């Protein structure tokens, strides 16, 4: 395992659930911004190495805390919303991104995971294709009756930019096809060769025009010209590697389908190879990496795909990535520089995050002057359990440090050279008070992060909460971004979300008017007021996410919205669950104390009596509400406690209630598939499944509109019980819930 992977896993292991949730939120925001810069603006502010390692840390935390995975998780994001200036095209099948492998050990893990999912033994032949990952711009070409009718960029995966006129100017893209299916969407990568890129930049320089930073930027900028004649003048190329909607199968295998595309006239990468083991895949990866500089175009890794298309169908998709493919990325780069200072930033949840200020250094073609230091343990050279990292070397101001382009919120400091440490340097003393409001900053047991206790009196937290409220996945108010929110807060115009909806009332007329602020006018002020009024009607999952409740990301917000469907129902259950949440806290504390006492006394811990005692006086309605909350698939005790804590804090609850009064319509979630026998039903799988794995069963049930829960309750409709079902099967019988065998379930969904 590589050093960056080890560090990422060590950091993830040291996180408490609260700290992990906070970190995932930070990563999600930074990567969302990077996606917009990369896909929509053709002006990336992170290199591929930065971006990939950002996602690597996110993946490590998600692996350690799978229940905390967010709806806006970087591993679930595809591209960015289409830019203004182009009409939009909706993809009939989403253009997905790929999961990443960053280390050689990830590849056999990927293969083993697929074998487990498909219930394939080690002896079963399992071919993969391995092809270079082109560093360009993804494009989808739609052909109907052999004619090119449209071309669209990836966009956000669901909707892309209509670049049909520009695509027609690319020589590698056929205008007509012979003997093609009636409907065929061909997907691939628009790119520019090294030679063509150099020649283009020479012409740009001679004309006094802007030159491009790299071939990828040149290709993306050229394809996304509003004037197709400019695109025609640029030497763009296209490799086909996949397909979307197709009216007739291209082949039975990935490799066969690529050959079909080649026969139809598309350029297929000739370094694509079929491999029969992880060892073959890694050998081909090494071969391509060795030849990388001589290929004549940029690549940033190798893509592995299951060759058998029936297996691809069975494996299916995650939210934004296929289970049957992975991109094995080339390693990032390192550089050494001097740590000039350590600054402390305060986040939305009060987390104190140390940031290294560095002597600027070029790492992989990008100048880096800031890097993350994660938390106080990382600076001290230890993990959250006290174990050493970096061989226990601490980090001090003045040190010579190694910067890894891991793309945290910023790149990260990976190592320190003690031989070059200046004399008389002092160990860094992490602050125990908030640098913004001077409130005490405490570190709770089990938490890797120190947090400001100031709450809403802390300006840093208040501003970050407001920024979160207007973020893209929350209320997403047109014309009201982070910059405007911060300015309004600093001037005393807004202090909480409800104030946003009173801006027109307070600053539309009178002495202090929005239209008279610098940078504003009559038209822009009116547009903002209208945009705010438009968001008085909001989807329930967006409202829940916008509140910025700790541990409640987009995934949890969507799960809660689907389960409760109305704000009133959610609020009532959370309120009713308050005594149970307190009992849960008491039980956790009691169990921890009992474990410690048992260890000190050399005896076996007696945990259940401690839990029973803590829960003894809890009212039954509170227990039922708690079971309702924690029984939602993906919503555990950590999220439930966080919800209750927020709702029980008088100031927070009053702020939420004021917001609710400003809203006119809270929309229930859109219904999932309704044309199946199990749509809308809550299903629990228990025991051993023989025809499919648990993951496959869950994915197929959800695809048919069912809701899969991890626990049996009165709201459960069906329990699918295999051998060894145990207590869940018994509870289903006691509650009179329909029990099905695996065969009966498959018969019910029409897949026996």
UniProtKB/Swiss-Prot annotation:
Residues 599-618 are annotated as: Disordered. InterPro entries: BRCT_dom (IPR001357), BRCT_dom_sf (IPR036420), DisA/LigA_HHH (IPR041663), DNA_ligase (IPR001679), DNA_ligase_AS (IPR018239), DNA_ligase_CS (IPR033136), DNAligase_adenylation (IPR013839), DNAligase_N (IPR013840). Keywords: DNA damage, DNA repair, DNA replication, Ligase, Magnesium, Manganese, Metal-binding, NAD, Zinc. It catalyses: NAD(+) + (deoxyribonucleotide)n-3'-hydroxyl + 5'-phospho-(deoxyribonucleotide)m = (deoxyribonucleotide)n+m + AMP + beta-nicotinamide D-nucleotide. Its EC number is 6.5.1.2. GO terms for cellular component: cytosol. Its cofactor is Mg(2+); Mn(2+). One of its GO terms (molecular function) is metal ion binding. It holds the Pfam family DNA_ligase_aden. Residues 599-615 have a biased composition (Basic and acidic residues). GO terms for biological process: DNA repair; DNA replication. NAD(+) binds at residues 48-52, 97-98, 131, 154, 189, 305, 329. Zn(2+) binds at residues 434, 437, 452, 458. PANTHER family: CHROMOSOME TRANSMISSION FIDELITY FACTOR 18, DNA LIGASE. This is DNA ligase. It comes from Jannaschia sp. (strain CCS1).
């Amino acid at each position: 395992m590589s050093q960056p992977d080890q560090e990422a896993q060590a950091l993830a292991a040291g996180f408490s659930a609260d700290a992990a949730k906070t970190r995932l939120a930070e990563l999600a925001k930074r990567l969302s911004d990077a996606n917009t810069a990369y896909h929509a603006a053709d002006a990336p502010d992170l290199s591929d190495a930065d971006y990939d390692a950002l996602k690597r840390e996110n993946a490590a935390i998600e692996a350690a805390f799978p229940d905390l995975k967010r709806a806006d998780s970087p591993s679930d994001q595809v591209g960015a919303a289409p830019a203004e200036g182009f009409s939009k095209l909706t993809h009939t099948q989403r253009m997905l991104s790929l999961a990443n492998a960053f280390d050689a050990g990830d590849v056999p893990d990927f293969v083993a995971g697929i074998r487990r999912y498909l219930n394939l033994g080690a002896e079963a032949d399992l071919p993969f294709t391995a092809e270079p990952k082109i560093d360009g711009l993804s494009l989808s070409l739609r052909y109907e009756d052999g004619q090119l009718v449209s071309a669209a960029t990836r966009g956000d995966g669901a909707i892309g930019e209509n670049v049909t006129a520009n695509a027609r100017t690319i020589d590698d893209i056929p205008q007509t096809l012979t003997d093609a299916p009636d409907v065929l969407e061909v997907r691939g990568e628009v790119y520019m060769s090294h030679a063509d890129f150099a020649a283009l930049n020479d012409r740009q320089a001679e004309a006094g025009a802007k030159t491009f930073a790299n071939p990828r930027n040149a290709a993306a900028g050229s394809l996304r010209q509003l004037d197709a004649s400019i695109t025609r003048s640029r030497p763009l190329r296209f490799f086909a590697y996949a397909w979307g909607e197709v009216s007739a199968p291209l082949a039975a295998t990935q490799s066969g389908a690529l050959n079909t595309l080649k026969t139809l006239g598309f350029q297929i990468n000739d370094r694509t190879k079929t491999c029969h083991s992880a060892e073959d895949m890694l050998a081909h990866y090494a071969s391509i990496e060795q030849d990388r500089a001589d290929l004549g175009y940029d690549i940033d890794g190798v893509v592995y795909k299951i060759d058998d298309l029936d297996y691809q169908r069975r494996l299916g998709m995650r939210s934004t990535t296929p289970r049957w493919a992975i991109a094995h990325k080339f390693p990032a780069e390192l550089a050494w520089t001097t740590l000039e200072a350590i600054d402390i930033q305060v986040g939305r949840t009060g987390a104190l995050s140390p940031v290294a200020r560095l002597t600027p250094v070029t790492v992989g073609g990008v100048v880096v002057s800031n890097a993350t230091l994660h938390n106080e343990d990382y600076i001290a050279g230890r993990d959250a359990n006290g174990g050493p990292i970096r061989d226990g070397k601490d980090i001090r101001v003045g040190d010579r440090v190694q910067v890894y382009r891991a793309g945290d919120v910023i790149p990260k400091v990976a190592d320190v050279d003690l031989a070059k440490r200046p004399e008389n340097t002092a160990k860094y003393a992490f602050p125990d008070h908030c640098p913004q409001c001077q409130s005490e900053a405490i570190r709770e047991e089990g938490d890797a992060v120190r947090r400001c206790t100031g709450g809403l009196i802390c300006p840093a937290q208040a501003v970050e909460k407001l920024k979160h409220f207007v973020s893209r996945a929350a209320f997403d108010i047109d014309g009201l971004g982070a910059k405007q929110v911060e300015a309004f807060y600093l001037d005393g115009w807004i202090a909480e979300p409800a104030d946003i909806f009173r801006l027109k009332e307070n600053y539309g007329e009178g002495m202090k008017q929005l239209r008279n602020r610098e940078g504003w006018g009559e038209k822009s002020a009116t547009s903002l007021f209208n945009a705010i009024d438009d968001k008085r009607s909001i989807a329930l999952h967006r409202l829940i996410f916008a509140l910025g409740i700790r541990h409640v990301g987009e995934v949890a917000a969507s799960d809660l919205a689907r389960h409760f469907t109305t704000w009133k129902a959610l609020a009532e259950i959370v309120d009713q669950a308050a005594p149970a949440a307190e009992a849960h806290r008491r039980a956790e504390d009691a169990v921890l104390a009992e474990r410690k006492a048992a260890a000190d006394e050399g005896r076996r811990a007696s945990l259940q009596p401690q839990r029973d005692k803590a829960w003894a006086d809890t009212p039954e309605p509170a227990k039922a509400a708690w079971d309702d909350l924690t029984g939602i698939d993906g919503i555990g005790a950590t999220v439930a406690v966080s919800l209750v804590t927020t709702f029980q804090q008088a100031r927070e609850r009053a702020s939420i209630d004021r917001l609710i009064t400003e809203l006119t319509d809270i929309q229930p979630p859109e219904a999932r598939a309704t044309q199946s026998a199990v749509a809308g039903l809550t299903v629990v799988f228990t025991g051993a499944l023989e025809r499919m794995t648990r993951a496959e069963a869950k994915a197929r049930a959800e695809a048919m509109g069912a809701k899969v829960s991890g626990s049996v309750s009165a709201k459960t409709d069906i329990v699918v019980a295999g051998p060894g079902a145990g207590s869940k099967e018994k509870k289903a019988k006691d509650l009179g819930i329909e029990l099905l065998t695996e065969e009966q379930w498959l018969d019910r969904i029409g897949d026996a």
